[in-house]
Amino acid sequence: EVTAEMGASVRYKIGTMMETPRACLGADRMASDVEFMSFGTNDLTQMTYGFSRDDAGRFIPQYLNKKLIEHDPFVTLDQRAVGRLMETAVEDASRVKKGIKYGICGEHGGDPRSIRFFHDLGLDYVSCSPYRVPVARVAAAQANVMAQTATQR
């Protein structure tokens, strides 16, 4: 009513945060109603592992030392679990509706290894803390160059 009364229009997009494994596994059911899906990788990692991010600092170093995990999953995205959930969501949603924009928000948006995975998955954007933006931009450019080089072979 207000926009009609004022003669103004507000452009907006409808999207969803994908922060739980259940959301990723149900992406196809949301796809027809959204224009974007943004993966909240911090919470998605926490929910996938069942770790509290607040407590993980106490035991992640031991897991790394014992080689139970390759990387701190709150720094570098775990592609085999969290990444697989993301891949499933993108594939399932894309089958239902073309043109959805996919991205991530979270600290993984500033990690070069994670950014390469996001590029390979075909995500449209990453969002991260301001101090990580320079690293994210360089990593995204490198991922793009590496993908182009691989295509030319």
Tell where the protein language model's regions lie, with residue ranges.
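Conserved alpha/beta-domain cores
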Residues: 1-153
